[in-house]
Amino acid sequence: MILPLKLKKIDLKNNKNLEFLPVVGKWSKSRKFLEFTNEDIAQIVKSDFDCLIRFGSGILKGEILNSSNLGVISFHHGDNRVNRGGPCGFWEVLNEEPSSGFVIQKLNNELDGGEVLVRGNLMTLGMWHTNKAQLIEKSKFFLIQLLKKISEEKKLPTSEDVRFHGNKLYKIESSKIMFEYVFKNYLPRFINKLFDLVLPPKITRWSVAYAKHNNFSKSLWRYHEIPNPKGRFLADPFVFRYGDCDYIFVEDFFYSDNKGRISVIKIENEQYEFLGVILEENFHLSFPFIFSHNNEIYMIPESGKNKDIRLYKCQKFPDTWVLDEILMSNVSAADTMVFFQNKKWFMLTNICSSSLGDHQSELHVFVSEDLKSNNWKPITSGNPVIFDSLRSRNGGLFFHKGITYRINQIHGKDHYGKSFGINKINKISEHEYSEERVSEVNANFKKGIVSTHGFSANHHLAAVDFARLSRSWRK
């Protein structure tokens, strides 16, 4: 993830394309509230602005809020459903919240009670400065997108429903808070560094397990764990039936070069046979989403390092695959899945709209008449359809009793793939997408595991992945 930790000052007065309207606000005694004179308001009204944008100028009050056609647009760095108050990104780290939010809102005279136009939630990072940086970068991008939309349509998007805010207003009222932050965040890192001086550093090592699920009645602790090959780990399982046997396609990550390949495991009579690597590129591959259509077998592995979404076709099952189509190019995408419904193809993928490389927060949906198209269209309701690190990132797809279920990864504070949710897709069309959470799975079904983020199933077999912390990858 790229974080803009260095801020660059720009002198706007040197920009000849900008016009300036100088106004001087009046601060309250507390230096928190800012109001403008009637003369200033009259000048602003005369200028006929579409909207005004507040950039950290204190809390605005009075007629300034009504002086432009569409009002005043403002950032709020924080999820106002969870916490209120600043500094940006601080309280989520201190309180170990799994996600950190921002809203872009139209201001009114009620503190934190503006009309929410855009809301986003990102995985909380481990340190305040990085968490703050990602919130600023992501919200900045979506503010620009909002302003472009306002410029084109000359109206604000539909705001969220009215919500009452009863949560605590946080303030740093003493140095005790900062000592608590240092104790919680720096001390554990210092201790881990000391251990790393005498022991190999801790790594997260994923594994895969499988079982005949018996109509999804078998408990996950009964699933058979497949030992990892030496110096590697297996993750992102996808189950596929071919003939009378089931196969599990997995990410096969080699620690020796920090790169994933796609490998396959044959399951027959509940016994496994590791068949080895079946697809490798000169960039990382993972998440081997496999499916069939018109008697052909296809795979869309994640190829985010190559900035594209690729469709491979099977020439000889299970070990011979060729690149068939580039579905999208020049895109920062992860964990792509497709399926055919109501005579259309739908793509669910995790795209980072900004330059952060964050694939945890945004779920995008695209539609196409043809599978082998490089002109997939976003659904008309707009992307992302979900903007929340607790619900967005794909972890699998399966079908049961005519219902399509999407697995999503659930991330904790600085904890990728902590658990996963199971969601029933209620509506998907070229115009809308909706789903509802039906279950959550926590990482407690195998001894010593700390994470689980992928699940796949057909009518016969199911597979799940999970991770443990280890101080050696050579085993």
Stretches found by the model and what they are:
Residues 223-224, 274-279, 322-328, 376-384, ...:
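Beta-propeller fold detector
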Residues 1-285, 289-298, 310-314, 325, ...:
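One-carbon transfer enzymes
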